[in-house]
């Protein structure tokens, strides 16, 4: 019975992830019967797009798997990263909106601990930990980790505070005494740094769980010509709050969603880098019991329903499903996902005012 329970919990956590470092360590945690503490940190930096739903759904999975989960509202991190013009009031307002989005997206927020980075930064012991982490990380390693901010290593030349950011992220994990660190693949370097430094400090190594990054609606561009590392490439091709046409936002209207998906990069028979298929896989089919209905005229094959992503991908790669039919089906299903979230945010006058103030200040 215990083994079955561990497998069920592991499978729930592992689904729709890119990697777990390491799977054996995670299974060991689940089998131990001990309290497991996990977290994700995010920058409250603007209006959430649907790519954020990927990690929000994974938070739900972890909570339902019995993990004691915290969400770090990385306000000071956002300030260092020049988000929202460095206006801490706007940054905190953005955090309040994200909480509402999580709740409307079905995350059991009553079982999640929300932590403002101010809580950490106000403790002198936290800064002592940052210094100890810095003593055990080379400057070159820290510079390479700047991609976790959506920045390139050379951008540290402009503002030295950028170098503190990776050290803070590693220290967050140690300060909160975490067993699991969740993040997108763009956070991998910080998590690997944390695992390396943990050994040097005699601390437990966090299990790193990495979720996929939803590609820009505009496609990969010159990704195939890039000589950068995977983190750099991901930063270039993912949905971005500062580039509205690359993303669907959780407050977009039905018509905007249809328009954006209709224009999205979606080459026939191609899976890699296809944002429409990624939305289907990581957002739509991530929900239990979801069925994608494709309505099309009889002369093009007639209506068809897909109860699994694997069925959808097979028909698409075989050419039995046209890109336009895929787009139309995904758009209509995505509208159903976004509609209650949009209503929860825009239906609250205070949230709506905060959103309007934030929208004009979104920065790279």
UniProtKB/Swiss-Prot annotation:
Molecular functions (GO terms): ATP binding; tyrosine-tRNA ligase activity
Positions with a binding annotation for L-tyrosine: 39, 165, 169, 172, 187
GO-annotated cellular components: cytoplasm
Top EC class, one word: ligase
Keyword field: Aminoacyl-tRNA synthetase, ATP-binding, Cytoplasm, Ligase, Nucleotide-binding, Protein biosynthesis
Protein residues bound to ATP: 49, 52, 241
Annotated compartments: Cytoplasm
Motif 'KMSKS' region mapped to chain: 238-242
UniProt keyword Membrane present: no
EC number: 6.1.1.1
Gene3D superfamilies linked: HUPs, Tyrosyl-Transfer RNA Synthetase
Principal place of residence: cytoplasm
GO BP term, pick one: tyrosyl-tRNA aminoacylation
Catalytic activity: tRNA(Tyr) + L-tyrosine + ATP = L-tyrosyl-tRNA(Tyr) + AMP + diphosphate + H(+)
Protein family (similarity comment): Belongs to the class-I aminoacyl-tRNA synthetase family. TyrS type 4 subfamily.
HAMAP family: Tyr_tRNA_synth_type4
Functional note: Catalyzes the attachment of tyrosine to tRNA(Tyr) in a two-step reaction: tyrosine is first activated by ATP to form Tyr-AMP and then transferred to the acceptor end of tRNA(Tyr).
Assembly information from the UniProt record: Homodimer.
Protein name in the entry: Tyrosine--tRNA ligase
Organism from which the protein derives: Aeropyrum pernix (strain ATCC 700893 / DSM 11879 / JCM 9820 / NBRC 100138 / K1)
